[in-house]
C-alpha cells in the first residue's frame, strides 16, 4: 500500500545517506575532544527523550480521536527519531577508539547509551506505525474501556518521562530510584490492562483489530519505558566514570 511504499522510500534514502555520510562523520569524530563527545551525546539523549515524550502523548490522543493526519505526522516524527539514533552507530567505532584512549569504562557505557537510545526509539516507532495503519484502514476505534486504561497509562508514562527528562537536563540523578518505583507500578498497571483485555476477548466483548492494536501499544509502551530507564542508568554511569558529579547545563 501507499504507506509501506513511503516507508521503504524513507528507509532506502536513509541507508543511502548513511553510506555517504559515514566517512565524513567518522572524520569529524577524530577532531572532537572527549568532552565534545560527552556534550553531544548528552544533547542528543535529552532531545530524543523530550521528543519521544511528545510523540507518545500525541499518538495516543490521536488514536482516541481517530485523527489520521496527526497519526501520519507522528509516524514521520518517530521514523526520523529512530533513524537519527541509528545513524549514530555509523560513528560508533571511531568514537569508541577516541574514548578508549582515555577511559575504557566510559567507552563501555557510551555503547550502552547508544544502544538503549536506539531500542527506545524503535519501541516508539512500533507504536506509531500500527496506530496509523489501524485508523488509516478505517478499522473500528478503541472501546471506552480500552481508551480509559490507555489514558491512565499515558498519565503514568508522562510522569515517568517528566522525571527522567528533568534528571537528564539537570544532571542530577538523585530521583532515579523513584523512577524505578514508578516504572514498576506502571508495569503492574500494564499487566492488569492486558489481563482485562484477554478477558474481554474470551467473552467476545472486544473487536479483534482494536484488541491487537491495544495489546501492541501496551507491550511496546512497556518496552519503551524499560529502555528509557536503562538509558537513564547508563547515562548516569557514563557521566560518573568520565566527569564525576556535575551539572550538565550551566
Which functions belong to the PLM regions below?
Residues 1-250:
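Cytosolic, long alpha-helical scaffolding segments
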